[in-house]
């Protein structure tokens, strides 16, 4: 939460996203949020946990799609690097946490595309401990929302067979429908930073009212992470320690 640089998280209505639940909002929502009172910056972001391949091995990682911008000016960017540089191109570059064991210059395969590691960061992991890999937002949208070639072909066949879209008297309708099916117009959340003098609760309520979306402050998001995600892991660890203590006591009793 701290490394994201956000004061507010705008997510799909009635969800606990983007960390505890899946969330999907249109990628043009951030423009109207930027014009709301008290908002200093707003940036789209995506999160996707998956296996990232490098050569013959793979690493489970949280893929973070970050919006174009500058460090310190765009929420969601890794706040600092230990080696290399930040992402400067719109495609096929990545910044990885050192816990992933990736090195500068490594070639990673994410879905159908390959990425070059240009920077390394530290202490950027998910709530489950998976290292983060940052890539450009457009690439991340494609990785999460775009179907594979076979699925796209099957979808187009179904669309062509649907008489509602394939009308003889409307020649451009089919092309428009096909184009809309191939776009990636969704993100998981919008990260918002506030102007000085504006309270998070006040701005969050304004966004909820006018945009009909769910908005979480930093305190609320911390509560979700601790209560919904970390608490479950803590209970599992506690149960394991209790079993270990019982087994150890039994072994000591048998020895005595």
Question: Where are each of the predicted segments found?
Answer:
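Peri-transmembrane interface segments
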Residues: 1, 183, 191, 196-250
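Short helix-loop capping/hinge motifs at secondary-structure junctions, enriched
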Residues: 70-73, 199
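A short acidic, helix-capping loop that chelates divalent metal ions and anchors anionic groups
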Residues: 16-20, 125-128, 224-226
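Interfacial "coupling" helices/loops that link adjacent transmembrane helices in transporter permeases
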Residues: 252-256
């Amino acid at each position: 939460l701290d490394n994201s640089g956000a004061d507010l998280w705008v997510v799909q209505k009635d969800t606990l996203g983007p960390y505890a639940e899946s969330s999907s909002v249109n990628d043009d929502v951030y423009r109207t949020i930027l014009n709301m009172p008290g908002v200093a910056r707003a940036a789209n972001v995506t999160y996707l946990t998956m296996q990232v391949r490098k050569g013959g091995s793979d690493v489970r990682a949280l893929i973070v799609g970050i919006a174009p911008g500058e460090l310190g000016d765009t929420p969601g960017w890794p706040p600092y690097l230990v080696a290399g540089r930040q992402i400067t191109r719109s495609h096929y570059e990545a910044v990885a946490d050192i816990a992933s064991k990736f090195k500068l210059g490594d070639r990673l395969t994410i879905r159908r595309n390959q990425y070059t590691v240009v920077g390394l960061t530290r202490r950027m992991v998910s709530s489950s401990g998976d290292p983060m890999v940052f890539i450009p937002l457009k690439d991340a949208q494609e990785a999460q929302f775009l179907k594979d070639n076979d699925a796209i072909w099957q979808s187009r066949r179904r669309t062509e067979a649907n008489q509602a879209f394939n009308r003889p008297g409307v020649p451009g309708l089919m092309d428009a429908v096909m184009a809309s099916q191939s776009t990636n117009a969704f993100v998981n959340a919008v990260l918002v930073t506030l102007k000085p003098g504006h309270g998070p609760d006040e701005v969050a309520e304004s966004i909820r009212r006018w945009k009909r979306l769910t908005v979480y402050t930093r305190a609320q998001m911390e509560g979700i992470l601790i209560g919904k995600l970390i608490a479950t892991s803590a209970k599992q660890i506690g149960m394991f320690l209790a079993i270990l203590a019982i087994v150890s006591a039994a072994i000591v009793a048998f020895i005595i």
